[in-house]
Curated annotation (Swiss-Prot):
Protein name as it appears in the record: HTH-type transcriptional regulator IlvY
PROSITE patterns attached to this UniProt entry: HTH_LYSR (PS50931)
InterPro entries named among the record's database cross-references: IlvY_PBP2, LysR_subst-bd, Tscrpt_reg_HTH_LysR, WH-like_DNA-bd_sf, WH_DNA-bd_sf
Organism of derivation: Escherichia coli (strain K12)
Keywords per UniProt: Activator, Amino-acid biosynthesis, Branched-chain amino acid biosynthesis, Cytoplasm, DNA-binding, Repressor, Transcription, Transcription regulation
Gene designation: ilvY
């Protein structure tokens, strides 16, 4: 079996969506289908049940998923072991984070890591912060910078970097939304909101609605990516609740079109940190990265 086919199969087994997996694995849908067909021919069994809307694993597919996870993990461990036979650490370390985190938190960490391990090649992928935890769980990333969810997956280790301030932002330039929020007591049930489509930030705005007794909020849009939320607020589409660091690292022309209405006073802090699979913390590259984190003990 080809390792690339196993990686593709594993992603599809998690996403249950051919188009999404094809984009994530940088292949065409037809290439992805051929890879799955190749595996099915090797095993002599169908791996998925497909219809127009859903993709589900067969019993053989479930068994192959376990095999693929174990095989790819063992291969990664073998690569790391071989890499360590040289005089210093080498190999590739795959990191996932948001564009904001790539500016705000990752550089000083990478500076320390590269000073100690200059032969390690960093492969950085940026995307929606809400996807960070899943990237680690599925093995698409070795490490990720992520907001800590209410319930941390049992298989994931989390090292905190910072407690982030969360702010409610609105358009600063004259527009109907600014007029709505500029009164002494805004009617929040009529104000359009820009929301994260998933993740800890989504949970924060839901708590904010509950605290302000807004049972039926007006949702203008749900967005993947906190940076896009700032842009939509700047355009006058609505208001949004998000980590202040996202606003601070937005381009100045966008930042200047936004104002802060309030800072969240939630008792539970918004924790940002680095996450990795617990079972992989002993791998030399991940272990070395983990040790240089500021709150490592």
């Amino acid at each position: 079996m080809d390792l690339r086919d196993l990686k593709t199969f594993l992603h599809l087994a998690e996403s249950r969506h051919f188009g999404r997996s094809a984009r994530a694995m940088h292949v065409s849908p037809s290439t992805l289908s051929r890879q799955i067909q190749r595996l099915e021919e090797d095993l002599g069994q169908p791996l998925f049940v497909r219809d127009n809307r859903t993709v589900t694993l067969t019993e053989a597919g479930e068994e192959l998923r376990v095999f693929a996870q174990q095989t790819l993990l063992q291969y990664q461990q073998l690569r790391h072991t071989i890499d360590q036979q040289g005089p210093s650490l080498s190999g590739e370390l795959h990191i996932f984070c948001s564009v904001t985190a790539a500016y705000s938190h990752l550089p000083p960490i990478l500076d320390r890591f590269r000073a100690e391990h200059p032969s390690v090649e960093i492969k950085l992928t940026t995307g929606d912060a809400a996807d960070a935890m899943e990237k680690v769980v599925t093995g698409e990333a070795d490490l990720a910078i992520a907001g800590k969810p209410e319930t941390l997956p049992g298989a994931v280790a989390f090292s905190m970097l910072e407690n982030l301030a969360v702010v409610l932002i609105a358009p600063a330039l004259p527009c109907p939304v600014r007029n709505q929020v500029s009164v002494e007591k805004p009617d929040w049930s009529t104000v359009p909101f820009i929301m994260a489509d998933q993740g800890p930030v989504r949970r924060r705005i839901e708590l904010w609605f509950r605290r302000n007794k807004i049972s039926n909020p007006m949702i203008y849009a749900t967005v993947g990516g906190h940076e896009a939320m700032v842009s939509m607020v700047a355009l006058g589409c609505g208001v949004a609740l998000l980590p202040e660091v996202v606003l601070e690292n937005s381009p100045e022309p966008v930042r200047n079109r936004v104002m802060i209405l309030e800072r969240s006073d939630e008792k539970t802090p918004f924790e940002l940190g680095v996450c990795a699979q617990k079972k992989r913390l002993h791998e030399p590259l991940i272990e070395a990265f983990w040790k240089i984190l500021p709150n490592h003990k």
